[in-house]
């Protein structure tokens, strides 16, 4: 089980990303538009740098919904390998069978 503070920190980052998504997208569009003047693009980069670091989507860590584990995360299911194994052994995931040969 992950520390509650780590999970909460990640949830806070998700909230910040949602809150600043439109502003960040607009500033990036201005900064990357080569048809605009260099000063305008530079000002957009400065405003982008003033945004909180945690408002960038790359700072979000995928975590298991059940345990909060940050590694061995299956994107399709939203859980870690440990949780997947537990649920699979209980027969709670349809179509998942233990392989044997």
UniProtKB/Swiss-Prot annotation:
Q: Which family does it belong to?
A: Belongs to the universal ribosomal protein uS14 family.
User: One GO CC term of this entry?
Assistant: small ribosomal subunit
Its annotated function is as follows: Binds 16S rRNA, required for the assembly of 30S particles and may also be responsible for determining the conformation of the 16S rRNA at the A site.
Assembly information from the UniProt record: Part of the 30S ribosomal subunit. Contacts proteins S3 and S10.
Entries under PANTHER family matching the protein: 30S RIBOSOMAL PROTEIN S14, SMALL RIBOSOMAL SUBUNIT PROTEIN US14M
Answer yes or no on keyword S-adenosyl-L-methionine: no
Q: Top-down, what is the taxonomic lineage of the species of origin? A: Bacteria, Pseudomonadati, Pseudomonadota, Alphaproteobacteria, Hyphomicrobiales
Family matches, as SUPFAM superfamilies: Glucocorticoid receptor-like (DNA-binding domain) (SSF57716)
Q: Which InterPro entries match?
A: Ribosomal_uS14, Ribosomal_uS14_bac/plastid, Ribosomal_uS14_CS
Q: Name one GO biological process term.
A: translation
- GO MF term set: rRNA binding; structural constituent of ribosome
Query: Which UniProt keywords are listed?
Result: Ribonucleoprotein, Ribosomal protein, RNA-binding, rRNA-binding
Q: What HAMAP family has UniProt attached to this entry? A: Ribosomal_uS14_1
Q: Provide the protein name.
A: Small ribosomal subunit protein uS14
Q: Does the keyword rRNA-binding apply?
A: yes
């Amino acid at each position: 089980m992950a520390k509650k503070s780590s999970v909460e920190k990640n949830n806070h980052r998700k909230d910040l990303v949602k809150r600043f998504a439109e502003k960040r997208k607009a500033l990036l569009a201005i900064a990357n538009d080569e048809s605009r003047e260099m000063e305008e693009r530079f000002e957009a980069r400065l405003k982008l740098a003033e945004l909180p670091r945690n408002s960038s989507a790359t700072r979000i860590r995928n975590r298991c919904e059940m345990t909060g584990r940050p590694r061995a995360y299956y994107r399709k299911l939203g859980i870690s390998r440990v949780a997947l194994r537990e649920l699979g052994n209980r027969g709670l995931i349809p179509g998942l069978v233990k392989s044997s040969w």
